[in-house]
Amino acid sequence: MIVLPNKVRIFINDRMKKDIYLGISNFGFENDIDEILGIAHLLEHLLISFDSTNFLANASTSRSYMSFWCKSINSATESDAIRTLVSWFFSNGKLKDNFSLSSIRFHIKELENEYYFRNEVFHCMDILTFLSGGDLYNGGRIDMIDNLNIVRDMLVNRMQRISGSNIVIFVKRLGPGTLDFFKQTFGSLPACPEIIPSSIPVSTNGKIVMTPSPFYTVMVKINPTLDNILGILYLYETYHLIDYETIGNQLYLTVSFIDETEYESFLRGEAILQISQCQSINMNYSDDYMMNIYLNFPWLSHDLYDYITRINDDSKSILISLTNEIYASIINRDIIVIYPNFSKAMCNTRDTQQHPIVVLDATNDGLIKKPYRSIPLMKRLTSNEIFIRYGDASLMDMITLSLSKQDISLKRNAEGIRVKHSFSADDIQAIMESDSFLKYSRSKPAAMYQYIFLSFFASGNSIDDILANRDSTLEFSKRTKSKILFGRNTRYDVTAKSSFVCGIVRGKSLDKTSLVEMMWDLKKKGLIYSMEFTNLLSKNTFYLFTFTIYTDEVYDYLNTNKLFSAKCLVVSTKGDVENFSSLKKDVVIRV
């Protein structure tokens, strides 16, 4: 670890795929409480800008921090990627503090699309922020557009809070020129922020929250000490369904269960977690997980690898102390309990955006202060991989699981998805067969539309057959050579329970790079949040899908795009009753 005079921390990580990865601690949307919710997320969208033909890049805003990364591709170099990312924050050697109203307006529209996307596919319910005075969704809404001048002032104010002590930088390689460049830019920031934000309200403990969830989860408040952080690292590397959450200076260990009986035993204090010592902890974490640790605990004064001897040699005492603290929090009700609930009728409170939720007090009734049993945890395997065809009945369940677990990766091709994970076969089956997970998986049917129409365009099946078997989406045609013939009509209007545009496009020079560039152009115009595309077996032919509230504008953009020599697009209007009758005539596509 290299520490600049203003406390910027720089790490060399030659194993990461990114060229540069930058995080800003104490800079997430928890800072929006008592301001306009969404300022942090809007700032993220305003800052990131790059040439998608030369770079891959992304950014994210979490509760307590913001992070950005960039990777060079094609003819660009690592140095180009570093300079591109730094340019998001600095202009002519000075920290950016000016944002045009037109750009702010476009990105607010994009935020509204992201809200729509996330609520169609996920259950975006941030319990901790809600209990601390925020909302269940804190990513920004379209009504921000009514206060553009105030929003712009808040964005400038937020930029002035950035200080050297907030900055963490990972680089793949660090030469003298790069280090000097960092000193001239991020190294020029003040060691402490020019504007000190107000303290974040303390969240309320001793609450039971009934909300959609794939698991029965208990958030246990523990002290944010070094030993407890090492204990969390130990548990995370060894077991599934254990993680942590932070808000302000508070730390919660999250423990999830698939068995309701075990969950209730843990809550009543009659059972403790069965934590076994493993042979060794390697700290072989992803760069995302490492960055999160440094940002959530900015007071860590050493490289995490400096603690590898301590976490292994002192694991017994660390885990005993952590186990005792967990149990004390259970007894004292320093917990937030999440109980899976999928009823739309049950509600006893709402956030300012009128999202309904049930919040109850966690009482001491039935507490047993002498545990007499232990609960086994799901152990991690080194690595596992499976391939699921689009016709497999478990397809949507696996997609749902990957969306609820950050350490599961999906890679899609024309025939199915390849899934990398670290579960045993028995554990993954137990999760997918659990009652709460099955209800969660079925509670957001919008994600299914992407695969319904992918199956329609890539197979010879009719829309009626596909809809009749939507739980398995039907297996694709196994013919390796299929010729897609486009009809005269380029637009088919349907009614579904989600608003989206999808279809197949073909072009002589069409490739993934051009489609990514197209996606970013649509994002800059505020018309979409993201666009998925799948390369079909026919040459230069892709399937596109995007959730959007601006369906006509997106259709017009795609319909007039000169890269497409042929196209067939479906435009869905949101409604209570599905109507796909326009696709029943044999005029759309023949395989």
UniProtKB/Swiss-Prot annotation:
GO cellular component term of the entry, any: virion component
Protein name per the record: Metalloendopeptidase OPG085
This enzyme's EC code(s): 3.4.24.-
Co-factor remark: Binds 1 zinc ion.
GO biological process per UniProt: proteolysis; viral life cycle
TM spans (from-to): none
Residues at the catalytic site: E44
Cofactor: Zn(2+)
UniProt function note: Probably involved in maturation of some viral proteins by processing them preferentially at Ala-Gly-|-Ser/Thr/Lys motifs. Does not seem to be responsible for the cleavage of major core proteins.
Subcellular localization, as worded in the UniProt entry: Virion
Gene Ontology molecular function: metalloendopeptidase activity; zinc ion binding
Native source species: Vaccinia virus (strain Copenhagen)
Free-text description of this protein's post-translational modifications in UniProt: Undergoes proteolytic processing during the course of infection. May be cleaved into 46 kDa and 22 kDa products (Potential).
Keyword annotations from UniProtKB, A to Z: Hydrolase, Late protein, Metal-binding, Metalloprotease, Protease, Virion, Zinc
InterPro entries given in the database record: Metalloenz_LuxS/M16, Peptidase_M44
Main enzyme class: hydrolase
Binding site for Zn(2+): H41, H45, E112
Family: Belongs to the peptidase M44 family.
